[in-house]
Amino acid sequence: SVGFKAGVKDYRLTYYTPEYETKDTDILAAFRVTPQPGVPPEEAGAAVAAESSTGTWTTVWTDGLTSLDRYKGRCYHIEPVAGEENQFIAYVAYPLDLFEEGSVTNMFTSIVGNVFGFKALRALRLEDLRIPPAYSKTFQGPPHGIQVERDKLNKYGRPLLGCTIKPKLGLSAKNYGRAVYECLRGGLDFTKDDENVNSQPFMRWRDRFLFCAEAIYKAQAETGEIKGHYLNATAGTCEEMIKRAVFARELGVPIVMHDYLTGGFTANTSLAHYCRDNGLLLHIHRAMHAVIDRQKNHGIHFRVLAKALRMSGGDHIHSGTVVGKLEGEREITLGFVDLLRDDFIEKDRSRGIYFTQDWVSLPGVLPVASGGIHVWHMPALTEIFGDDSVLQFG
């Protein structure tokens, strides 16, 4: 007769629903779950669904004031991971209503915000997300995309070439600009600020921007080609970041750069909107990604961070090189490279793609192969990445 009974209860009673048929509007997630010894996989999967949606550790009377059935995440399928002991892929469906429109920040806060510290789990990794068109349509996405960038630069049918200016720290702005000019004059399309170059005592950002702009215009005049330098606008505050982007626009240069993980998705999305409104291309560096994506059984796979960036906005993103790594790695990398570039990507577990993804004409992002590559890698790089890529040397 008691209408309400408190106490700890199993999550799987409410959140494990193997008979659930996913909706076209659901956000689907694939988690690699390693339960603690003695915790059944259904309970672990349901715990993930609960804690990343409407659940808390007990029943509360306010649950009766809403429709949990409408708002709860559901673990709808669990499968063991081949070759791994006590690891499972748990598939979770989230109703679209749980997420704020146009906010990657809110999406991640909900899906991966709390659940990774969960006691019932030894480890947890978000392997993939299916973003439904109903949600992706609430995002601007990349400021320009691959085709518009090629049209702006008048460069077709080949990868774009770039290099990072070294030594990355310690040069004066004048000498930095000299190096930029030599590289661009020598035939590169782009040069790049290193991700650590922001505005340090030995080279303040405004001086660097001026000397780099001078180098760009000189090289353009002498070669008759359009040149660019990724001016790093990353800063300690969003206001300062936008200030730097405004100055780049005033100089008339074609592209700025941002570290999207250290800078954060909120700042990145603001910058992407500014770039579209003002005709700037946006180059994205992924500093800090390995902190999140390197462990095989815990964290977030980079393909999820790549999808999130396509939604938040960027025209280029660093995506690894593949060169000299294992074959399997190559397939996985090509999987998320296609997720960045293509309109429609079929589910293909051999490439790590857990869901079919339809981007419905959201602009594509150019993958940037960067990090320890040199001229002898060229044949492999062009074969792996094809024409729609940026090969970033140095």
From Swiss-Prot:
What is the predominant subcellular site recorded for this chain?
Answer: plastid
N6,N6,N6-trimethyllysine: residues carrying this PTM = 5
Residues where N6-carboxylysine occurs? 192
Q: How is the cofactor bound?
A: Binds 1 Mg(2+) ion per subunit.
Reaction(s) catalysed (UniProt annotation): 2 (2R)-3-phosphoglycerate + 2 H(+) = D-ribulose 1,5-bisphosphate + CO2 + H2O; D-ribulose 1,5-bisphosphate + O2 = 2-phosphoglycolate + (2R)-3-phosphoglycerate + 2 H(+)
| Gene Ontology biological process terms from the UniProt entry | photorespiration; reductive pentose-phosphate cycle
Q: Which residues bind Mg(2+)?
A: 192, 194-195
- Residues holding substrate: 114, 164, 168, 286, 318, 370
Q: Which cofactor(s) are needed, names only?
A: Mg(2+)
EC assignment: the record states: 4.1.1.39
Matching PROSITE patterns? RUBISCO_LARGE
Any one annotated GO CC term: chloroplast
UniProt PTM = The disulfide bond which can form in the large chain dimeric partners within the hexadecamer appears to be associated with oxidative stress and protein turnover.
Where is this gene product found?
Plastid, Chloroplast
- What family is it from? Belongs to the RuBisCO large chain family. Type I subfamily.
Task of the protein: RuBisCO catalyzes two reactions: the carboxylation of D-ribulose 1,5-bisphosphate, the primary event in carbon dioxide fixation, as well as the oxidative fragmentation of the pentose substrate in the photorespiration process. Both reactions occur simultaneously and in competition at the same active site.
**Quaternary state and interactors:** Heterohexadecamer of 8 large chains and 8 small chains; disulfide-linked. The disulfide link is formed within the large subunit homodimers.
Q: What is this protein called?
A: Ribulose bisphosphate carboxylase large chain
Protein source organism? Nelumbo lutea (American lotus)
Q: Which classification does the entry list for the species?
A: Eukaryota, Viridiplantae, Streptophyta, Embryophyta, Tracheophyta
